[in-house]
Amino acid sequence: MNKNHRHTYEIRRAIPQDCAKLAELAADVWLDTYATDGIKPEYTEYANSTFTTAYFQSLLEHPTYRLLISEQAGVLQGFVLINLGAQYRTPDNGYEVDKLYVHKSFQGMGVGRALLSHVARLYGTPMWLYTWTENAANQFYSRLGAQLIGTLSFEAFGSTIDNNVYKITSENL
């Protein structure tokens, strides 16, 4: 049980019964973060076809993925998905934080940091992640003291998406 000055929450491994809530939260956070120019049909299609109950169930069964959630009294606040098999450039950067999604109602309350700290206790550090250069989460990673170690770009929705790549060590948590 984690406590901060605002609330108490539990962090635990996700179970199959969490998958429907995870799908809803993921679609919600994704649209809130990336649909900055409004809800276009292709955004809705992506979110609804990607973040499904079956998607999260498959992650629970995948040998290199680990999925942890933060909840309070059955209310899902956020989750972290790590991929122990993914590397960025070199093994020295550790494993990948594939997703760190916190519902906007719980952002700024220590949930994201607590999820990353819990992951570090279970799987060690360092860990790396990438985030869209226009994502407000860049401020969070900067405050955390994460080290900017590169950039990563890919094509999506007819545009080039530029991302910052960060490395997080135990000193950041």
Residue ranges and their predicted role:
Residues 2-5, 160-173:
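Terminal substrate-recognition subdomain of acyl/acetyltransferases
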Residues 5, 9, 13-19, 24-37, ...:
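Acetyl-CoA-dependent GNAT
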Residues 54-59, 144-145, 149, 162, ...:
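A general structural signal for short secondary-structure boundary/capping elements
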Residues 66-69, 129, 164:
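Hydrophobic beta-strand residues of extracellular immunoglobulin-like
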Residues 110:
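Glycine-rich phosphate-binding loop
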Residues 113-114, 134-151, 159:
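Conserved active-site alpha-helix within GNAT-family acetyltransferase domains
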Residues 122-133:
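Conserved GNAT acetyl-CoA-binding A-motif
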